[in-house]
Every structure is written in C-alpha cells, then in structure tokens.
Amino acid sequence: TRGDQLPTRWIDQGATQGLPIFRVTNRRHAGLIEDRLRQHVADKTQWQRMLKGNNDDLNLPSVRDDLLEKCRLDLQELSDQYGLQGIQLLDQELTTEIAFPVEQFPKKVKSFNLDKQPLMEGVLQGIKGQYLILDTGVINIRKYTAYNVEFSVEA
C-alpha cells in the first residue's frame, strides 16, 4: 500500500491494527516482499469473521520481528539485489490502532445482494471496513458504488 494511503487502506479492509514494515521504490519490489511474507501469514481478509467482531490486539512489532526472522534469508537476498534505496526496513514505526463504530456485531453474517433483492431494510448497527452492519444483514457498500441508492430514517 502506498504510504499516502495509510491508514485508509487498513480502514477499508476492516483492520483494527496496522504497522508499516517496508518502504519500497516500486510496486514490483512490494510484490516480491509480499510473496516472501505470505508463505508465513495469510494475506486475505476473511470478511465474514471480520464482521463478527474484533480480533484480540497483537503486539505487531513483535509479530513483525518474528516474521522478518522467518524470511531473513529471502529478504536479505532482495535487499542485496535492489539495495537500501529499493527496499528499506521500517523498524521504528508505531502501531496504528483503528476503532470502528459498531454497537453490535452479527452472530451470523448474512450478506445483502441488491441485484437479487433490491430492497433491504434494517437498523444500522455499525460500520466496519467497507461494510454497513444492519440488524438484518451486512452489505459491502463499495460493491454498489455506481448504484442509485435511497436511504430513509424513521424516528
């Protein structure tokens, strides 16, 4: 993720914590690093699990250090190949904590599909990542960017 997109990208993903690890000069270098790291950690969001609640906070600097140790030889090879300007370790960054406005998480995640059912009703329980959480289901609002949607509020 580009530096100017943090923490926006983390918020979009529904992350409750984030920590930059590397600064690179181009997308190719980022991809090479990601290929090494994903051998040890999942790189996909499990959206249903994410919408059921918040994970326990982690000590991200410690997780980073453990991950870097597991990938040390591969990362050293990349650093030797592309130099300090191409791949720079960010070992002094602070963990970003993100709180989402959610009154109640769903026990079971049911996703709305406006193409199949154009009317959805419910009481807004919260927002996490790209999702609106209602008492009747969830909707990935980004999926419907070009749609004309009407909201109504009843007191």
Residue ranges: model-predicted function:
Residues 37, 91-93, 127:
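Domain-scale terminal segments
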Residues 139-155:
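Structured surface patches comprising rigid loops and adjacent beta-strands/short helices at the edges
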Residues 118-126:
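Structural detector for short beta-strands of small beta-barrel domains
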Residues 1-3, 122:
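GIY-YIG nuclease signature motif recognition
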Residues 96-116:
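Short boundary/loop segments of OB/S1/cold-shock single-stranded nucleic-acid-binding domains
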Residues 130-134:
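Short aromatic-glycine-enriched beta-strand elements
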Residues 3-82, 151, 155:
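Aromatic/basic micro-patches that form nucleic-acid/chromatin recognition or nuclease catalytic surfaces
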Residues 77-102:
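Divalent-metal-activated hydrolytic enzyme cores
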